Amino acid sequence: MKTSTVIFGGFFMADNGERIQIPVLENPDIREINRFFSVSNFEKKAGVLVFRIIPEPKFGHTELTVYFEKGYYLPMIQTILEDGDIGVENLKTENYSVKTMEIWGDFYPIEHISKNISAIQNIISEFIRQKQTPAPMV
């Protein structure tokens, strides 16, 4: 049986507007990710974090992308469904209010966005832990 690998990378914007590439990590553990969050001061920055499962499974979670801007986080998990379709899971998938918030120039229901960095770290931890086990987000 092949084992899967989680690849982590991304970028953030420095205060001077420069794009800072995050070094790619293979199979990061949650301590590395938490340490990265603690030293990066993300609540004042904008950027994108990507966790990708390689090789891509036939079905299940394949990628977690976390968009962040000014202390707000938008996690999105891409999932290959058993019928081969692609789905995206967010923090909340039904009963939206009409309120939206702009993240990286696009508007999203506020229910998809969180200021709670601990919740985002838990989502990342769960994604890394389960790798390709299909499961709903918290």
Where are the predicted features?
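Acidic, proline/glycine-rich low-complexity IDRs
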Residues: 1-45, 76-138
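Amphipathic, interaction-prone secondary-structure segments
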Residues: 38-84
